[in-house]
Amino acid sequence: MNNTVRTAARSDDGNHDKFLTFCLGQEEYGLPILAVREIIGLIDVTPLPQTPAYVKGVINLRGKIIPVIELRSKFGLPTVAYTAETCILVVEVAGEEEGSASFQLGIIVDSVREVLDISRSNIEPPPNFGTSIPMSAIQGMGKVKDKVVILLNINSVGAKQGLEKISGDAEAGSGTPARQLQQAA
């Protein structure tokens, strides 16, 4: 498997990209639709000791161990109680090192909205101020009708965490994931 993850689906005319949108509080975010593998309801997450607060643990999804992060915590947003709309987006993230394989990552979000087709001419660079989100995590700002959608760079959101080291086959038993995550940090 190569280390690149296609980041956006292009429309037939090649001038639009498709994004799955979701909410964290009142803010709407978007991820390139081709990076999203599936959307699942909130299921039990097995916690990992001695990991950052935003790393909620791992899930076993059809025999595959998938690390799960809470995007609210990662972005420094206040925590809220989970609701019936809270779900996990399973996304494909490029490996951090050149030549390393991509891996799947679960992202807990407040709710999923819709798939938007955004014209590239309506995507602007992110502002350089006033956000708790690292600038490398923002791909751009999508203008859609009367709102702005924060478009995330999933490879940056999921990178620099060592999470690919704890992703894998549940039956392979890849050692102690918490220790691997600590060593990668």
What are these regions (language model features)?
Residues M1-A185:
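An acidic, low-aromatic, low-complexity terminal/linker signal
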